Amino acid sequence: MVEGEASSPAFTIDYAVATGDWPAEDVLRGLVERAVTAAAARTDGPLQASLSVLFTDDAEMRALNARFRGKDKPTNVLSFPAPDSMVPPGTPRHFGDIALGYETVSREAKEEGKSFEHHLTHLVVHGFLHLAGHDHETEVEAEEMEQLEREILQSLAIGDPYA
């Protein structure tokens, strides 16, 4: 497992590459920093916070999805918002954790004719928006979240992921 830390203007980002054929650490770090910085600029999240990102494989994503969502199948991204009650007074808030599954991310990018990096950036943005309280349980919520994703990705020169 490769672990490290990076900082965006408002976030300290801890990352871990557990398993999977992920790009090099510096590529992942740059991608996550750009995605988080762009998404944070468009949300009402905290001014300072920490965030953890786990790059793993479908086996671990399946286990996490089963444990926390009751769905016994792998998924591309999972988000785990940190409760505010976990923050000791005077310390930066831990915003939450994002986990990404390599095989699903890779397969989806190929099936949808997208670059792996663009699809991964989209999923980091998507996961971050979940941490910020956005959801897509209803059609209205989904439309609002997807539009926000489009705007954030456009600011990163990435095309509409839903086109």
From Swiss-Prot:
Its cofactor is Zn(2+). It is found in: Cytoplasm. SUPFAM superfamilies: Metalloproteases ('zincins'), catalytic domain. Pfam families: YbeY. Its main location: cytoplasm. GO terms for molecular function: metalloendopeptidase activity; RNA endonuclease activity; zinc ion binding. One of its GO terms (biological process) is rRNA processing. Binds 1 zinc ion. GO terms for cellular component: cytoplasm. Keywords: Cytoplasm, Endonuclease, Hydrolase, Metal-binding, Nuclease, Ribosome biogenesis, rRNA processing, Zinc. Zn(2+) binds at residues 126, 130, 136. Its EC number is 3.1.-.-. Disulfide bonds: none annotated. Belongs to the endoribonuclease YbeY family. Single strand-specific metallo-endoribonuclease involved in late-stage 70S ribosome quality control and in maturation of the 3' terminus of the 16S rRNA. This is Endoribonuclease YbeY.
